[in-house]
Amino acid sequence: MRIKILVRLKGQILEPQGKVIEQSLNSLGFTEFSNIRQGKLIELDLPDNISKEEKSQKIESACKKLLVNDIIEEYEVLG
């Protein structure tokens, strides 16, 4: 079972990478884009025979212990 986890900075955290992307797009003539935020996508596999509850528990534990800095980041499990 393929799991995708989207990690991004919390909304109130200044995001310089997104700002640089926005400025670069503007300089290339793409002035319609604004409020750009950049994140990371983590993909991992879990066995198919794992229960939904155990899957959720393992994902949450991995995110809290290693994958996400919950002080400045938030995450969303996709799909």
What is each stretch, according to the model?
Residues 1-79:
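Non-catalytic terminal accessory/regulatory regions of metabolic enzymes
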